[in-house]
């Protein structure tokens, strides 16, 4: 469902949709499939797109382990500046994630810096 999110880039992200979630907060379940879909306008020409997912736990941002980082597996690369991108990322929630509430920052990074960035609240069960 549609998530409320904070843009942490330059306003590129127009929509964020996460399986079985909506509103301010998302509860995700370890070992279960998860689909995150983000719509944004590409702010640069890039040959690559690297996925970075950070969870802020006790005030410290830590990289979420066990996730695919090659964004070109989910969106056609190279990307041209101005292209409308529909980025659909499907994964299984890593079983090693601790059961905590956290603010998550998801970034897609291109050759020239951040392509898109969104923050949202989530809890792992």
UniProtKB/Swiss-Prot annotation:
Keywords on this record?
Allergen, Secreted
A GO-annotated cellular component: extracellular region
An example Gene Ontology biological process:
sterol transport
Query: Record's InterPro entries?
Result: Ig_E-set (IPR014756), ML_dom (IPR003172), NPC2-like (IPR039670)
Q: Which SMART domains match?
A: ML (SM00737)
Protein's recorded name: Mite group 2 allergen Gly d 2.02
Q: Name one GO molecular function term.
A: sterol binding
- Major place of residence: secreted
Q: Which family does the similarity line name?
A: Belongs to the NPC2 family.
Its domain of life reads Eukaryota
Instruction: Give the UniProt subcellular location, in the record's own words.
Output: Secreted
């Amino acid at each position: 469902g549609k998530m409320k999110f904070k843009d942490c880039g330059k306003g590129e992200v127009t929509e964020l949709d996460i399986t079985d979630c909506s509103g301010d907060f998302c509860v995700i379940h370890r070992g279960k499939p998860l689909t995150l879909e983000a719509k944004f306008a590409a702010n640069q020409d890039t040959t690559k797109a690297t996925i970075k997912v950070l969870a802020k736990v006790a005030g410290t941002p830590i990289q979420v382990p066990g996730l695919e980082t090659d964004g070109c597996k989910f969106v056609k690369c190279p990307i041209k500046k101005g292209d409308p991108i529909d980025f659909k990322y499907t994964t299984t929630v890593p079983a090693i994630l601790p059961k905590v509430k956290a603010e998550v920052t998801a970034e897609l990074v291109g050759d020239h810096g951040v392509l898109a960035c969104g923050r949202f609240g989530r809890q792992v069960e």
